[in-house]
A protein has these predicted regions:
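C-terminal structural segment of proteins
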Residues: 1-128
């Protein structure tokens, strides 16, 4: 396979483990998200769907060329993650539509992520 498919309900902790062999820098940044307790419960789909302009996940995923897969009943559509974010607090998501999955290219060593913050975790935003 040339891409990695990540279900929207994948916790940040599980994502860190799964992504490390392919994108170690992204995995290292995930360790800086929130706290261990939050990473064990929070999902990557929720991180994206929330649409927060201070979220750490979307900048790294956009830099990786991620595709977002949305669903409403039996209707599915895909779009580049960068096209999902329209404006501050506004996403390209229709009523009843939810994030089903994210796919990213499987290539390795193409991204460097660094989180600049005063604290190791529970601080905001990253540079990718």
């Amino acid at each position: 396979a040339t891409e990695i498919r990540i279900g929207a309900m994948t916790t940040l902790s599980d994502l860190e483990t799964a992504i490390a062999p392919h994108h170690p820098s992204f995995a290292a940044m995930i360790r800086r998200y929130a706290s261990v307790q939050v990473r064990n419960a929070a999902t990557i789909g929720g991180n994206i769907a929330n649409g927060s302009p201070i979220g750490d996940g979307p900048p790294a995923l956009i830099a990786l060329g991620a595709t977002l897969h949305l669903r409403h009943g039996d209707t599915r559509r895909s779009l580049a993650l960068e096209d999902f974010f329209i404006d501050y607090g506004k996403q390209d998501r229709a009523a009843g539509e939810f994030v089903e999955a994210i796919t990213i290219p499987k290539q390795t060593d193409t991204l460097r992520c660094y989180k600049l913050s005063k604290r190791f975790d529970q601080d905001i935003s990253a540079v990718c």
